[in-house]
């Protein structure tokens, strides 16, 4: 009688970082843990094999761990990132009373959102006491910062429903991210879906949004379009905004991973007092088009990546509505190339990037010998960066260092960064870092003149060295974090009041500005019960400068900021989310009691203010109904220049979502970006992998390349893992028996 051997289904029982472990047998870092086993292996499993594993049919372990979004596979593709701080997460704040990106970021202790109008129609992003020009803005890891002015940098054609997360990237040395970088990441709600949202409310507010996604095989597509308008909450504050955005990814079997995104935005808005507080009749119109293409490829121990991007921006500003005063036409082109090598001593990265900025304008740049259409001025400049970085993780420690040079019209500058981390206990991580950064003067800094302002062509780059310390702890449903920083800034650019120049603002560089800050945050989050989420945060900033001058922007930072968010669920399908925040801004502004008359003015200090927002929501199946109320207490406040912002504003809306498939998977890990964790995909799949998080520390650039098949050599060192899923409570669960449906293909969006 023949002795028939039955093929057994292997199963991982535990995880470790030993040299003989299964993933270590691959002789490479597992950058992303989707090691999908082919269907043939699953189908060949016999009943005997299933019976063999019957002793593990129960859930082996349930992990309740924090989730961190990943958008990069290489370690620092362009510049080293010391840490990644989450500012917004769509899943965690799905029920929060936020309608725009600005309202989503307003509660973060690291960010100061300064609006001039309602619903984020014109706003600036300030990071940790820096100015809006010192903030780099990234969309899915691509730099789309506007070279003319930071006012336009985050005017991106993306609505809040397409944004999966927003992260603050600390320690991005090089040209641009003087105070830090904000990375906005997009992802579909489901693998394949169609969604419509409509809302209306006070002040003639109306909003309509149509979005959807298609995932087929190795191809994924996300597309969205929206229209938002209002009659305004006071004279000349009406607005209209159109957005269109598309993102497509494709993973070729041999060519690598391709990521294409493109978008267009058109907005017009009344600008009552926006740029001169005494003038109520200003008006502005902007149009922005952007696109980028990114490629990623892994070959053995090497990882390669390249990207190219383009942003086009038109801006028309009327001092008096209907009479064009300034027109600007800006082009920003970028390209990037890098390579990583993973070896026994760590991961070494080498790369470079190039940026070209050009502007046609009616008053910015050098005068043209012959007008170019309606434009009489133009200016162009190019910058480049080269860098070398090495990172190493050893037991509970991680270290990284980088060195590079920046090539600008102002000469060659050397840049560096250092970082280290230590994980003394599960859930606890300590990190420290230092980095050097710089920012070039914008075209507005160099050339803008007006009846109240004088330009300065002698400006040079701003420079800073920043020191960071962070600590994070998480256990079960609780999380705590502490961050402190000190930024020593030199040659800071600001508009300075000069009586000796006819009582005008003059673009100048003060010699020193030191900024100190501390941020505390804590939260409690569960997936069920009455109380679902409570978060509390506090931020404090103080500065020290070596000159006693009247500056327009450097000294009106947010000194104190505290925020509380609470979310409760009741009556099965109802939820209520409330956010309460207190703001205390340093500095003063000039108040004009009579609109249109600059001769009467007085200096006022910024007053503390309190904001309370809420959302009541009902959801069943494909339908979600909600009522929003912002500034419920009808507080009178301003973010800058004495421009009053809206009082109580109520809106209501409906969202209909038809789709299938799970939401795109997320990477779950410990509270620190440098600590190791587990990959637990959403949905039921035969996969689970251990991640060495040092591979993506501070990425935020580039996409993770997904492994589509498990090579035979993998089985020489161990068997593949048991299936993973996420239960109804949102916990990662590791099972023992594979699903009969086989592996569902995850989305490539993050």
Predicted region positions:
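Outer-membrane beta-barrel signature, preferentially recognizing the C-terminal barrel domain
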Residues: 275-299, 423, 429, 436-490, ...
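Extracytoplasmic beta-strand/coil segments of soluble accessory domains associated
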Residues: 102, 106-146
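Gram-negative outer-membrane beta-barrel transporters
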Residues: 392-396, 486-488, 509-591, 633, ...
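N-terminal periplasmic "start-of-domain" segments of outer-membrane beta-barrel proteins
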Residues: 62, 66-96, 124, 132, ...
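Short strand-turn segments of transmembrane beta-barrel domains in outer membranes
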Residues: 165, 173, 180-214, 225, ...
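Flexible loop and strand-edge segments within Gram-negative outer membrane beta-barrel domains
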Residues: 230-237, 241, 251, 255-332
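Structural signature of Gram-negative outer-membrane beta-barrels, strongest in the C-terminal barrel
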Residues: 262, 345, 349, 369-489, ...
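Short acidic/polar hinge/loop motifs at secondary-structure boundaries
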Residues: 142-171, 185-187
